Amino acid sequence: MATNIGMMDSAYFVGRNEILSWINDRLHLNLSRIEEAASGAVQCQMLDMTFPGVVPMHKVNFEAKNEYEMIQNYKVMQEVFTKLKITKPLEVNRLVKGRPLDNLEFLQWLKRFCDSINGGIMNENYNPVERRSRGGREKSVKGSSKISKSLQTNNMHHPPVATSNKPAGPKQAKSHGIGGGSNSSAEVQALSKEVEDLKVSVDLLEKERDFYFSKLRDIEILCQTPELDDLPIVVAVKKILYATDANESVLEEAQECLNQSLGLEGYEEEGKEEEEEEEEEEEEAAAAAETQT
């Protein structure tokens, strides 16, 4: 099994939309963001689809919201990895934080791994809805079936009510103010145009977001190259890339870390001392010139 997939493998260049389509098509879900798969439940079911019967799906919690609930799903996944002798390390602490880059990378690996097993062909005999034993969607379906059954039994016990064939009285026409129709039509057109403009704006923003996201992803892939992993500049870039909070001091910390690694702080201090000495010499020379005059 292709468990060792290098960072420069084509698998890590698969886009976010393709990953989401892969998940939604196979598991009959409706995910719109990569972060929604941070609980680990989706990954467990993908493994269950690829290796039927290996994953204890009754232990997988699709409603996990807290980190401790998500960690339980990753424990199930780790047990499956052990059974299948998969050597891929699970960075649970990063994945449960819901960071898009970390979760996208893991899902890219998972897709590449599953495709290497089944050739990218969907298992037509697999019913993902039935296999999910704890999902909220399945609960709602069960509830609706119970309601329909109760309605059927009630209809069996109660005879149908006879309907009258008498013609109904004339309905009173709703009165509209003069010009009301034209005003409402103009409002509808204005609102429709506003909606279209907003859709265009959202589309442009999504494209811009995806563009910068792909750039960040390229930088991350480059930084994770083993030959570059320990370089001071790469360590500084990772510090900024993996910062969880929008903290302005992150850049300063990264610069300080880089300066320490390169030994630039000593040079800066020496430069300051030299400048101070030069200033003192200039002041002494100026004072000596004044005394001579």
Swiss-Prot record:
UniProt superkingdom: Eukaryota
Knockout or disruption consequences: No visible phenotype under normal growth conditions, but root growth is affected in response to gravity or touch stimuli. conditions.
Residue span of region Disordered: 124-188, 262-293
Database matches in InterPro entries: CH_dom (IPR001715), CH_dom_sf (IPR036872), EB1_C (IPR004953), EB1_C_sf (IPR036133), MAPRE (IPR027328)
Keyword terms: Cell cycle, Cell division, Cytoplasm, Cytoskeleton, Microtubule, Mitosis
Pfam families: CH, EB1
Gene3D superfamilies: 1.20.5.1430, Calponin-like domain
Tissue expression from the record: Highly expressed in guard cells of leaf stomata, pollen grains and pollen tubes. Expressed in young roots.
Compositional bias ranges of the Acidic residues kind: 266-285
CC per GO annotation: cortical microtubule, transverse to long axis; microtubule; microtubule organizing center; nucleus; phragmoplast; spindle; spindle pole
Record's compositionally biased regions (Polar residues): 151-166
Subunit structure: Homodimer and heterodimer with EB1A.
Record-stated family: Belongs to the MAPRE family.
Listed name of the protein: Microtubule-associated protein RP/EB family member 1B
Source organism: Arabidopsis thaliana (Mouse-ear cress)
